[in-house]
């Protein structure tokens, strides 16, 4: 098994404020009245926005299992809180993000397709003060 690593580089001209959250455990499918986990994620993101975070590390378990619906809900939560000014986001796969599909490769492929970056992405953030 070969892992392909990706590198993303960001330059910001302000103080770096990093927020770390994890375990939103979003539902893998649309269910009636299934909003608690989504609401908790939105609330957490709102707190990080108020604190001025310009980078967020999501440390695993976006969904309760690998699911396009959960990943779409995750991205929609960021958009609803931050609008077009979404901060740098590093999303890491947790153990639950590897459940639900037959192979871990399928889980990584879905994660990469829906989240927009590989779970093996290295981030470099350069802070420049004027």
Predicted regions and their residues:
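N-terminal active-site segment of His-dependent metallophosphoesterases
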Residues: 1-71
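Extended active-site neighborhood of metal-dependent phosphoesterases/phosphodiesterases
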Residues: 3-10, 68-129
């Amino acid at each position: 098994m070969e892992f392909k690593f990706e590198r993303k580089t960001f330059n910001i001209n302000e103080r770096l404020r990093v927020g770390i959250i994890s375990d939103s455990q979003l539902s893998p499918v649309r269910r009636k009245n299934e909003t608690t986990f989504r609401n908790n994620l939105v609330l957490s993101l709102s707190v990080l926005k108020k604190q001025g975070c310009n980078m967020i590390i999501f440390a695993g378990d976006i969904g309760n299992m690998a699911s396009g619906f959960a990943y779409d809900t995750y991205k929609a939560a960021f958009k609803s809180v931050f609008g077009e000014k979404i901060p740098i986001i590093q999303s890491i796969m947790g153990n639950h993000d590897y459940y639900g599909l037959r192979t871990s490769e399928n889980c990584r492929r879905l994660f990469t397709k829906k989240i927009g970056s590989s779970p093996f992405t290295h981030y470099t953030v350069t802070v420049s003060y004027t």
